[in-house]
From Swiss-Prot:
Keyword Secreted part of the UniProt annotation: no
GO cellular component: cytosolic large ribosomal subunit
Lineage, opening ranks: Bacteria, Bacillati, Bacillota, Bacilli, Lactobacillales
GO molecular function: structural constituent of ribosome
Keyword Ribosomal protein found: yes
Name by which UniProt lists this protein: Large ribosomal subunit protein uL29
Organism: Leuconostoc citreum (strain KM20)
SUPFAM superfamilies listed in its UniProt record: Ribosomal protein L29 (L29p)
């Protein structure tokens, strides 16, 4: 799980890369769920929340850069 404090230290490019990784993981988890191979269904919710955290930090950085 990614913590917001850890994410704030990353650059915009790193955050976008992390978002893409989480989205790919979510896709794979949903595929596993559909095929009946997923054991830990709570992981889907965790990844969705991680994506939301990353997007929040990205937007905060964009707004901070716009105000400069």
């Amino acid at each position: 799980m990614a913590k917001a404090s850890e994410l704030k230290e990353l650059s915009l490019a790193d955050l976008q890369k992390r978002e893409a990784e989480f989205k790919e993981e979510l896709f794979n988890l949903r595929f596993q769920l559909a095929t009946g191979q997923l054991e830990n269904t709570a992981r889907i919710a965790q990844v969705r929340k991680d994506i939301a955290r990353v997007k929040t930090v990205i937007r905060a950085q964009e707004l901070a850069n716009a105000n400069k």
